């Protein structure tokens, strides 16, 4: 059984959280004939710094030396997505390759404009995911008119088109405001 924890910020008590999740999963299997292992992975999408928090439970608590061997030490399996190498990204064969590439490039350049020409198989899911993980609602806004979106270049074009349209609208509003104020002054 796998658990996936998506993080955009470093969580200093992640091993304790994982211990709770895994404990609940094992408890849920208590009455089953066979208990299967529970593996929790933390997918960290932070682009400003690497994961700096403890990755095991014993790093969070003070355990007297004489009790150390009796205390379980839950480990946080943290994967720093924005820090993957090109070789690691190349191993992905699903849409996740597009996601990983996006965050690596966002880390390298905060003003990164998506330029990945890889075809997106699950457009809804990718755009919703990017919206949530980046806090940028424009990705989800593209969903209302996703026709013709097949790769990240299309997404970038839609973002640019929306930005241009908003700029034109704002320019029209400011122009109208200026005309009204000139007319009122006469």
Q: Which residues make up each language-model segment?
A:
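A general recognition-element feature
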Residues: 1-166
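Assembly-interface segments of oligomeric complexes
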Residues: 169-186
């Amino acid at each position: 059984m796998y658990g996936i924890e998506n993080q955009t910020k470093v969580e200093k008590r992640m091993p304790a959280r994982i211990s709770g999740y895994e404990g609940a999963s094992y408890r849920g299997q208590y009455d089953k004939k066979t208990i299967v292992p529970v593996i929790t992975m933390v997918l960290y999408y932070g682009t400003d710094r690497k994961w700096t928090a403890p990755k095991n439970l014993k790093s969070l608590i003070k355990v007297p030396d004489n009790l150390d061997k009796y205390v379980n030490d839950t480990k946080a399996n943290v994967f720093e997505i924005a820090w993957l190498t090109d070789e690691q990204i190349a191993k992905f064969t699903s849409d996740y390759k597009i996601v990983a590439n996006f965050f690596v490039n966002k880390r390298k350049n905060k003003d990164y404009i998506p330029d990945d020409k890889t075809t997106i198989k699950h457009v809804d899911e990718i755009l919703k995911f990017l919206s949530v993980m980046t806090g940028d609602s424009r990705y989800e806004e593209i969903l209302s008119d996703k026709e013709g979106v097949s790769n990240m270049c299309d997404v970038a074009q839609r973002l640019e088109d929306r930005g241009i349209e908003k700029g034109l609208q704002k320019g029209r509003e400011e122009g109208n405001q200026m005309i009204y104020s000139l007319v009122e002054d006469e």
